[in-house]
A protein has these predicted regions:
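Active-site rim/loop-helix segments in enzyme catalytic domains that contact anionic ligands
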Residues: 1-111, 238
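Metal-dependent de-N-acetylase/amidase catalytic core
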Residues: 1-14, 95-243
Length: 243
């Protein structure tokens, strides 16, 4: 596997996901380690998660609820720049050229060295991780990252009309990928991850105290599989050099 860029050399990271809470389930502990090290992290949500939830809240109220929850969750891990795309809907996300263009726009605005997103590859043994929207967000992000973001002739209106210069992202990190091989120790940031996920009350309140145990169990298993010392907690990613 490629050796990831040292955190000390990464000034900005862009996280692109399909729904509110996706980044927090998959990478909140890692994100907190980055922000505590001085890395500027931006969240980009492709939808407002309007199909999520476990109660009878009117659907038209859900986007505002989930946006507020995501902003609170982001704050728990040190992220203040949270952006939402408009015009895309939970349950019907596709890696269209329009979605790719909108992600390229943010890549050129933020100019990150690293992008973290969802794996575009279906994981048959963990089908729950392969929600179609997750696959679409990951596919659109990878297409945006290479080659469009660095190509001045891709979406030329971004350069001519908006003045957004091409940008080369050097590294992609994929969540929920079957071939993930880079574990990050999140023992010291687990409480931040838990706080972030509790902030998504419309999605997690029904779990009660079981939420902490589930997260702890997942993190412990990942750490054990990565050969970390007993009692450690981790998140795992597939890292791809894209520079």
């Amino acid at each position: 596997m490629p050796e990831p860029l040292p955190t000390a050399e990464v000034d900005r990271v862009l996280v692109v996901v399909a729904h509110p809470d996706d980044a927090d389930f998959g990478a909140a502990g890692t994100t907190a380690t980055w922000t505590r090290a001085g890395v500027e992290v931006t969240y980009l949500l492709c939808t407002y998660g309007d199909q999520g939830g476990f109660d009878d809240t009117p659907r038209e109220q859900v986007p505002a609820i989930r946006e507020a929850e995501q902003r609170a969750a982001a704050a728990a891990v040190g992220v203040s720049d949270v952006r939402f795309l408009t015009g895309y809907h939970d349950g019907s996300l596709d890696p269209t050229r329009e979605l790719q263009r909108d992600i390229v726009r943010v890549m050129r605005q933020v100019r990150p060295r690293r992008v973290l997103t969802q794996s575009p590859e279906r994981w048959w043994d963990r089908i729950g991780a392969s929600h179609p929207d997750h696959l679409a967000a990951g596919e659109a992000t990878i297409r945006a990252l290479y080659p469009a973001a660095r190509n001045p002739f891709a979406y030329p209106e971004l350069l001519t009309d908006e003045g957004l210069e091409p940008w080369t992202v050097e590294e992609a990190w994929l969540m929920a990928d079957e071939r993930a091989d880079h574990a990050v120790d999140i023992t010291d940031t687990f409480d931040a991850k838990l706080a972030a996920l509790r902030a998504h009350a419309s999605q997690t309140a029904h779990l009660g105290d079981d939420l902490e145990e589930r997260l702890h169990s997942w993190g412990r298993k990942v750490a054990e599989d990565a050969g970390m010392a007993p009692g450690r907690l981790a998140e795992v990613f597939r890292v791809i050099a894209t520079g």
